[in-house]
UniProtKB/Swiss-Prot annotation:
Keywords: Amino-acid biosynthesis, Arginine biosynthesis, ATP-binding, Cytoplasm, Kinase, Nucleotide-binding, Transferase. Substrate binds at residues 73-74, 95, 188. Catalyzes the ATP-dependent phosphorylation of N-acetyl-L-glutamate. Pathway: Amino-acid biosynthesis; L-arginine biosynthesis; N(2)-acetyl-L-ornithine from L-glutamate: step 2/4. This is Acetylglutamate kinase. HAMAP family: ArgB. One of its GO terms (biological process) is L-arginine biosynthetic process. GO terms for molecular function: acetylglutamate kinase activity; ATP binding. It catalyses: N-acetyl-L-glutamate + ATP = N-acetyl-L-glutamyl 5-phosphate + ADP. The lineage of its organism: Bacteria, Bacillati, Cyanobacteriota, Cyanophyceae, Nostocales. GO terms for cellular component: cytoplasm. Its EC number is 2.7.2.8. The record marks 38, 251 as: Transition state stabilizer.
């Protein structure tokens, strides 16, 4: 082994030790706290990124946090609709969900995507349990109310008992965003919304949305304009001023709503960055946008 190689290894090991040392106060601070992660976007489609997210979730559990993973699965739903000859339709950004589409959504999210994530977490050394809103009356749905979108729902109620039981015993709940109303009719609910409502009901330490953007940007075309930290008032001003627009509006609104109901901090981060979760939670700088209930408290 060359001298340069030895020096490189020493530097790499020193960096690893530095990272662990920097993480220690955060590990101590968040031990026993609940972190709700919404998993979606490119991090679900890229197998390498998927592996890193799974390992990050298991790491959180191993160091004493209580992670709860909520997932979507739009691309796989579209793939199966195509295979079955059902046209995917959208209205105002929402998937039009008629009865045949609802059957496919439930089959894909609950039967395929959810169980794949559970299996991957278990293979990585975690203890995952797959759920949808129907299990243990976890989520009660109601119609979203917009005309012509079918069985698209909103969260009417969250029963946290099953989540608390699992998380307090070392299990990692993995939740798909399908739920039923009081009559048993299934509804497709936006996964960001489900994550936000679960975080609020649990009084979670953090809500983290994995997205395909750096966070809130002053100029959406320039990743260098990332806004690292805002409070609820500033977040609302960014929406009203048009800085937050398009698909970011429901994400920021979801964060603001959860904070108003008691979540300590909400984060919008880029799931395409390797180990984005660990970088955001356990480093001094973070990598995305953190939204707080009041002025940087």
């Amino acid at each position: 082994m060359m001298v340069n190689d030895i020096e490189y290894i020493r530097q790499a090991e020193a960096t690893r030790v530095q990272v662990l040392s920097e993480a220690l106060p955060y590990i101590q601070q968040f031990a026993g706290r609940t972190v709700v992660v919404k998993y979606g976007g490119a991090a679900m489609k890229d197998s390498h990124l998927k592996d890193q997210v799974i390992r990050d979730i298991v790491f959180l559990s191993c160091v004493g946090l209580r992670p709860i993973l909520v997932h979507g699965g739009g691309p796989e739903i579209n793939s199966w609709l195509d295979k079955l000859g059902i046209e995917a339709q959208f209205k105002n950004g929402l998937r039009v969900t008629d009865a045949p589409t609802m059957d496919v959504v439930e089959m894909v999210l609950v039967g395929r995507v959810n169980k794949e994530i559970v299996s991957l977490i278990n293979q990585a050394g975690g203890l995952a349990v797959g759920l949808c809103g129907k299990d243990g009356n976890l989520i009660t749905a109601r119609p979203q109310g917009q005309e012509g979108i079918g069985f698209v729902g909103e969260v009417s109620n969250v029963n946290i008992k099953i989540l608390e039981t699992l998380a307090s015993n070392g299990y990692i709940p993995v939740v798909s965003s399908v739920a039923a109303d009081d009559s048993g009719q299934a509804y497709n609910i936006n996964a960001d919304t489900v994550a936000g409502e679960i975080a609020a009901a649990l009084g979670a330490e953090k809500l983290i949305l994995l997205t395909d953007t750096r966070g809130i940007l002053k100029d959406y075309k320039d990743p260098g304009t990332l806004i690292p930290k805002v409070d609820i008032r500033e977040a609302r001003e960014l929406i009203n001023g048009g800085v937050v627009s398009g698909g970011m509006i429901p994400k920021v609104t979801c964060c603001v709503r959860s904070l108003a109901q008691g979540v300590r901090a909400a984060h919008i981060i880029d799931g395409r960055i390797p180990h984005a979760l660990l970088l955001e939670i356990f480093t001094d700088v973070g990598i995305g946008t953190m939204i707080l209930g009041s002025q940087y408290s």
